[in-house]
From Swiss-Prot:
Residues 127-139 have a biased composition (Basic residues). It is a peripheral membrane protein. GO terms for molecular function: calcium-dependent protein binding. This is NMDA receptor synaptonuclear signaling and neuronal migration factor. Residues 38-48, 302-311 have a biased composition (Basic and acidic residues). Couples NMDA-sensitive glutamate receptor signaling to the nucleus and triggers long-lasting changes in the cytoarchitecture of dendrites and spine synapse processes. Part of the cAMP response element-binding protein (CREB) shut-off signaling pathway. Stimulates outgrowth of olfactory axons and migration of gonadotropin-releasing hormone (GnRH) and luteinizing-hormone-releasing hormone (LHRH) neuronal cells. Interacts with KPNA1; the interaction occurs in a calcium-independent manner after synaptic NMDA receptor stimulation and is required for nuclear import of NSMF but is competed by CABP1. Interacts (via the central NLS-containing motif region) with CABP1 (via EF-hands 1 and 2); the interaction occurs in a calcium-dependent manner after synaptic NMDA receptor stimulation and prevents the nuclear import of NSMF. Cannot be competed by calmodulin. Proteolytically processed after NMDA receptor activation. Cleaved in a calcium-dependent and calpain-sensitive manner. Calpain cleavage is essential for the translocation process from dendrites to the nucleus.
Length: 532
């Protein structure tokens, strides 16, 4: 990048020095004109303005938009350019001074000898004959070759005579008039090569860059197209690389920001500050009705018969069921109260442990030693059924104390936000506990094993997974509470690192042994038996 910038600065300074040399040459020649021609009083400022003299006064004498003048360059002995016509209708040669065309050459005779790169302006005075024609834009202008050569070569010869030892003026060369719709074409053969004492005019117009159709409007030197293109290409490549690097950096920042935001949202869900209000399945079904394609089409009830009879039958049936349930409830409550009225009775705490939990076989060894009311039950996750689990719970309760019911229960299994992985291919979600019959039957029978004499609601703790990490977890707990009515049961699933989690762990486990087991739960380097 530094090399390209220094190259551009060098090219710019060289262009400025070349322009300054041309300006000094033009001013020197203007002074020469002011001395040799008394009518030129303004020196260098009047040099290029004489071409428009006599045309500024009358608006009808303004040149047509297609008429252009050219400043031709003489470089390395080659003369390129043409004198365009200026179509002026009704203007004679005697009205006002004739326009002058100045050609830039490299002859140093008129300039000081110390100026190596001097540039002189050769004055070519021409008198053009124009034809008056109403359609001058479409008709070509015609002039005799002899008169054109005679008019142009006369001042050139007089000026060339005043120059000491200069080469022949390019305007005196052989002119080949080629009439065109727009201009006179002055085509000249190339002059012989200049002597070796003249350096080539650098950084002027490129031969390929100027065509005959496009006029040369300025003699300001242009930059070297090759080096300029190289610098431009380099800058473009640098800008493309910078844009690519900027996009990569912005993408990395966005990715890191999204990860931070996702972790923060997860943290907020875990601490419970963004707890979404629970929405039951019935409320969700009321808002949006959706049914499976295999469900039968709902039919409107036939209202031809009297519906009062059917409603009376249903109400009477519900009344009988409620009466039976109330009788059973009172009977079971009395039996449980009689069983628990003994001295030294401790309400049982049941631990239901899934074999899917890593190192679950060591969990019964880390429970509290000072609390005999804790009943651990380890079941096979792969082969056990809901009936097997319920029978094992009833058997353990009868062994502990006949007629005792569960006051507190811990379900230690795998799962995730919003679901419980109780058995193989049996995942408890808020929707499945309402649809699957075996799951509904399991939770209803489990509710009958809960205590009826407990003045506080019975508690079921969930460990091994964080159910409330998802709003569906709250929906699952709400549906389970609905299934287990009329028994008062609450579900809790606190984080283990929180204060509620520590209290839950201390209810069932020896806290020191539990932390030791937790640290070795996923380790294969040390057997837990050696630690115990």
């Amino acid at each position: 990048m530094g090399a390209a910038a220094s190259r551009r600065r060098a090219l710019r300074s060289e262009a400025m020095s070349s322009v300054a040399a041309k300006v000094r040459a033009a001013r020197a020649f203007g002074e020469y004109l002011s001395q040799s021609h008394p009518e030129n009083r303004n020196g260098a400022d009047h040099l290029l303005a004489d071409a428009y003299s006599g045309h500024e006064g009358s608006p009808e004498m303004q040149p047509a938009p297609h008429n252009k003048r050219r400043l031709s360059l003489v470089s390395n002995g080659r003369y390129e350019g043409s004198i365009s016509d200026e179509a002026v209708s009704g203007k004679t040669a005697t009205e006002g001074p004739q326009p002058r065309v100045y050609t830039i050459s490299r002859e140093p005779a008129l300039l000081p000898g110390s100026e190596a790169e001097a540039i002189e302006l050769a004055v070519v005075k021409g008198r053009r004959q124009r034809e008056r024609h109403p359609h001058h834009h479409s008709q070509p202008l015609r002039a005799s070759p002899g008169s054109s050569r005679e008019d142009i070569s006369r001042p050139c010869q007089s000026w060339a005579g005043s120059r000491q030892g200069s080469k022949e003026c390019p305007g005196c060369a052989k002119l080949v008039p080629g009439p065109s719709p727009r201009a006179f074409g002055l085509e000249q053969p190339p002059l012989p090569e200049a002597s070796g004492r003249h350096k080539k005019l650098e950084r002027m117009y490129s031969v390929d860059g100027v065509s005959d159709d496009v006029p040369i409007r300025t003699w300001f030197p242009k930059e070297n197209p090759f080096s300029f293109q190289t610098a431009t290409t380099t800058m473009q490549a640098i800008s493309v690389f910078r844009g690519y690097a900027e996009r990569k950096r912005r993408k990395r920042e966005n990715d890191s920001a999204s990860v931070i935001q996702r972790n923060f949202r997860k943290h907020l869900r875990m601490v419970g500050s963004r707890r979404v209000k629970a929405q039951t399945f019935a409320e969700r079904r009321e808002r949006s009705f959706s049914r499976s394609w295999s469900d039968p089409t709902p039919m409107k009830a036939d209202t031809s018969h009297d519906s009062r009879d059917s409603s009376d039958l249903q109400s009477s049936h519900c009344t009988l069921d409620e009466a039976c349930e109330d009788l059973d409830w009172d009977t079971e409550k009395g039996l449980e109260a009689t069983a628990c009225d003994t001295e030294g009775f401790l309400p049982p705490k049941v631990m239901l442990i899934s074999s899917k939990v890593p190192k679950a076989e060591y969990i019964p060894t880390i429970i509290r030693r000072d609390d005999p009311s804790i009943i651990p039950i380890l079941y096979d996750h792969e082969h056990a059924t809901f009936e097997d689990i319920l029978e094992e719970i009833e058997k353990k309760l009868n062994i502990y104390h006949k007629g005792a019911k569960i006051w507190k229960m811990l379900i230690f299994c795998q799962g995730g936000p919003g679901h419980l992985y109780l058995l193989k291919n049996k995942v408890a979600t808020f929707a499945k506990v309402e649809k699957e019959e075996d799951m509904i039957h399991f939770w209803k029978r489990l509710s009958r094993l809960m205590s009826k004499v407990n003045p506080e609601p019975n508690v079921i703790h969930i460990m091994g997974c964080y159910i409330l990490g998802n709003p569906n977890g709250e929906k699952l707990f709400q549906n389970l509470r609905t299934l287990m009515t009329p028994y008062k049961v609450t579900f809790e699933s606190p984080l283990e690192l929180s204060a509620q989690g520590k209290q839950m762990i201390e209810t069932y486990f020896d806290f020191r042994l539990y932390r030791l087991w937790k640290s070795r739960q996923h380790s294969k380097l040390l057997d837990f038996d050696d630690v115990l």
